[in-house]
Amino acid sequence: MVLSPADKTNVKATWDKIGGHAGEYGGEALERTFASFPTTKTYFPHFDLSPGSAQVKAHGKKVADALTTAVGHLDDLPGALSALSDLHAHKLRVDPVNFKLLSHCLLVTLASHHPAEFTPAVHASLDKFFSAVSTVLTSKYR
């Protein structure tokens, strides 16, 4: 999915507003994912998946850091996320549908923390961005 110049502006502006909360929001989005879609827990059998878990928060920070990298490379997502795509496709073998589930929970988390900024245009831009990231992360599955 191609991001328009307006989408790129919206994504960058939103990520700037998130600032130092990206890791926190990543952890919260993972908690939402595990609660809403329990089958996603199967990829983390060694984690304490209880609310507020340090392991979930740490992995949420990894997710947020990867998204921050993607935001910094909106014109070359495949290049920026190539190693992560290899990891998820070849080593972790994450079912691609899980990226959509996490993307949804990321949108909910961001909307709950920034309701005034979460306009329909921003929502659409972030949805397209998360979809583009998901597409890149699943590109090596073929």
UniProtKB/Swiss-Prot annotation:
GO biological process annotation, one example: hydrogen peroxide catabolic process
GO cellular component: blood microparticle; haptoglobin-hemoglobin complex; hemoglobin complex
PTM sites of type Phosphoserine: 4, 36, 50, 103, 125, 139
One Pfam short name: Globin
Entry keywords, A to Z: Acetylation, Heme, Iron, Metal-binding, Oxygen transport, Phosphoprotein, Transport
Modified residue annotations for Phosphotyrosine: 25
Modified residues (Phosphothreonine): 9, 109, 135, 138
Domain Globin: 2-142
Binding-site list for O2: 59
Binding locations of heme b: 88
Superkingdom to which the source organism belongs: Eukaryota
Keyword Aminoacyl-tRNA synthetase among record annotations: no
Molecular function terms from GO: haptoglobin binding; heme binding; iron ion binding; organic acid binding; oxygen binding; oxygen carrier activity; peroxidase activity
Keyword Isomerase found: no
Tissues expressing the protein: Red blood cells.
Purpose of the protein: Involved in oxygen transport from the lung to the various peripheral tissues.
Subunit structure: Heterotetramer of two alpha chains and two beta chains.
Protein's recorded name: Hemoglobin subunit alpha
Gene: HBA
